[in-house]
Amino acid sequence: MMGRNGIRLALKRSFSTYQPPVVEITNITKLWPTLRPEVRDEIKEYLRWRMQEDWRHIPLEETKAAYFLSYGPCGGRSKGNEWNVGYTGMRIVFNLVLFGGAATAFYNWKQDKKLEEQLRDLV
């Protein structure tokens, strides 16, 4: 009995329509630290979508919110987005190993094809 109710509830939730959370964009600078990450992502996506339109038709509050998210303490210029030398070095080494291995495999494959053709000519 408990399993059927759980399945019904799950189906009911999966068939329901999505309702985005209502957040006042006018207070985005104060509300931003308290918002859940999912809500933050939705606000960012909404503002990106709005900024694709003609900016003359976008309300001033939304323009200010987009500016805050782009240039404020939470955007790409935040302290958490500083360049990390160790991480960058490890990414370079990883990519060199990855693409070096792929290049070596491709070179060996070409050499094997040439060797195979030479062996066919001998027979």
Curated annotation (Swiss-Prot):
Keywords: Mitochondrion, Transit peptide. Pfam families: COX4. It comes from the Eukaryota. It is found in: Mitochondrion. Residues 1-37 form a transit peptide. One of its GO terms (biological process) is mitochondrial electron transport, cytochrome c to oxygen. InterPro entries: Cyt_c_oxidase_su4_fam (IPR004203), Cyt_c_oxidase_su4_sf (IPR036639). GO terms for cellular component: mitochondrion; respiratory chain complex IV. May be involved in telomere capping. Present with 1170 molecules/cell in log phase SD medium. This is Maintenance of telomere capping protein 3, mitochondrial.
